[in-house]
Structure formats: structure tokens, C-alpha cells
Amino acid sequence: MDGLPGRALGAACLLLLAAGWLGPEAWGSPTPPPSPAAPPPPPPPGAPGGSQDTCTSCGGGGGGFRRPEELGRVDGDFLEAVKRHILSRLQLRGRPNITHAVPKAAMVTALRKLHAGKVREDGRVEIPHLDGHASPGADGQERVSEIISFAETDGLASSRVRLYFFVSNEGNQNLFVVQASLWLYLKLLPYVLEKGSRRKVRVKVYFQEQGHGDRWNVVEKKVDLKRSGWHTFPITEAIQALFERGERRLNLDVQCDSCQELAVVPVFVDPGEESHRPFVVVQARLGDSRHRIRKRGLECDGRTSLCCRQQFFIDFRLIGWNDWIIAPTGYYGNYCEGSCPAYLAGVPGSASSFHTAVVNQYRMRGLNPGPVNSCCIPTKLSSMSMLYFDDEYNIVKRDVPNMIVEECGCA
């Protein structure tokens, strides 16, 4: 590795990170390299020079890289690195192959009922707090994923299976289901009733236990109907059991006592009723016991050469991902760049660890413990909320940890 020039070594550092081989501490200056003829600029005036002030493991202290916006275009290698980074954080091997879209009417209804967002006239989805920034209050708390799965039918289903859903656990076998519900639309047909009376029915939702033959469990609910509308049925137990078995297909049978005689029709998968297609909503959490220490960092403003955070926004339309990522419209691929002189690395709070602070104190006394140099790296990462389709056409709302660089420091 010592024989590699700074620009090649920096590019290798970026690609290894995107492939998941390096941790977030290596996310330093993830920007395209300059042309071979462009020498790195000298250290800023007044700052100590030499290798001690740069991060040789990541291709230099900011001098060996150029920002994407300075290139006048988004570099292909940079975009590919960002793509791999996002897919790895979503635990996806590749981008979902969206061959046929979920009917817009069904998606609009689901988002509206969940108060999750709205669809604009141009077809784009607006989701509160999903603007590409960090989700508020997400750091240090348990991460909650929301999964929306729409009902399907096929010729392989048994005579008893009315509906089935492919519910993904997003690659996590230890998800704990906080709540899961079936949303079912009950439609009222013309029927003569006494004035002020309601139609009272009992809806039974049977869910099949995989591996137990014809064994079914049931959830019952009495429903008083005055008009057509949506109703929810708790199926938390069924979804939790599904996740624990490592399976994805949920088979349901819906039966309604007195529905026929009272002219009540449960709407299943009907081409003429796409806006009323049944769907399942799952809220699951995966606890994170790690604690982060808040540190303050500089913002790159064009006037400082010290370690700072550079903001950079990538529109998903530019990389052709707006077909499977519903919201947000883009990603803040912020990164860290700049030099790390010894006096900055030794300031309490700017180092990422106690070990780093001790090493820097040795340096300042002239007792260098070896060829260990400071890097400008993220010291605070935050979560990002995303709403997207997975391979099974589930709509997934997920708080993805450690997605956005919030602050940078020297370590």
C-alpha cells in the first residue's frame, strides 16, 4: 500500500468503504481524484507541513481530492460508490427490479390511511421528515421500520386462502414486531334498514401456520357498519411467527358472518377496486445499544482548509433510482475533507477516541509513537428515513442508521 500514489490510494479507500469492507471511520473525503497532471496543493499557510498533518491511509488530508461540484459534473466512480453505500445500508445486494409498478391508487390509499404522506400532481410522493436530512430524534434510540405489503392472489393458493402477502424482514432475523395490522375495506351494497340502524357483522381473519398442515389461528372482530370504509385487524402474532421462521409468505382467509345477508362485501384483489386493495402494515424495531458522543465540527465554507464537513446532495433521478425509492427525492452524501494539524488533533473533543487523544499529546511533546497520522473522518453520523419498494413490491419505511455525516473531526 505504501507504493501507491495518494490519489490511487484515496480512490481505493472510497471503493472499499462502499463495498462494505471499511467502517464509517474511513469515510474521509469521498470525492473523485484530480487529473494526474494536477499536483496536490501545499499545506495552508501557518499549518505544519509534512506527512504528520495528513492522513496517508485515505489519500491525503484533503489536498489529494477534488469536490464533485468542482468537476462540473458528478463523477461516475463517485456515484457508483454512493450507490453501493446506500444498498449496503439497506442490506440489499442490488437495486430492486421494478418490472411492474404497484397500482398508484393502492399506494395513494395506503399512504393516506397511515398519514405517511401524499402524492403530488406530478406523481412524486411527499413524506414528512423524509427530505434527505437526518430523521429527527433518531440518534440513540431504537430504530423502527415500517413495512407495507399489498395483497396478492395466484392459482397456487388453496381454496381456503383468500389473500396472501409477501412480507420482508429486510434481512434482519431478530426483528421484534411492535404492531402489525391487516387493513380491509368493507363495502356496503344497497340494503333496506330501519332509520338510524347499522349493519353488525363479525369478521374472522384466519392465518395459516406454515409447517403445521391445516392448522389455522383466528382473529375475530365485531364491526358496526354505517357506511363503507376501512377496518383494521391485529395480526402481530402471525407476523412475528413468520419472521421467527425466516419465511415471507403470509396466507390469510377472511370470513364474514352475516355479510351476505346484510349486503356487506369485503373487498379483496379486484381489478376494479385497486384503491381498496387490502394491505398489511408492520412496525418492527431493532434495538441499537451503541451510544454516540456529541462533538462539534466545522462546516466547509471555502475559506478554511482545516478538517470540515462538505455538504453534497445527490438527486435519485440523476442515478435512475426514483422508480424504486419513493422518498426522499435524494441523498445528502456529505463527506469530510481538510487537513489535521497536530494542534487540532490534540484538542479535546475533536479526537474520536481516548487513544487518539493520548497519541496526539505524545506528538505535541515531540514523542512520536510511530508513523500514525491524523485523518479527517466523521465523528457523528445520523439516521435517514427512507420509503422504498423492495424486491417483493413491499413498501418499506425504514430509519437507516449511520447514513448521513453530521460532523467531522481529526483522529
From Swiss-Prot:
CDD domains in the record: TGF_beta_INHBB
Induction record: Increased expression in methimazole-induced goiter.
Keywords linked to the UniProt accession: Cleavage on pair of basic residues, Disulfide bond, Glycoprotein, Growth factor, Hormone, Secreted, Signal
Region feature (Disordered): 27-69
Gene Ontology CC annotation, any one: perinuclear region of cytoplasm
Carbohydrate-modified residues: 97
Domain of life, source organism: Eukaryota
Pro residues: bias regions: 30-47
Protein's UniProt name: Inhibin beta B chain
Gene: Inhbb
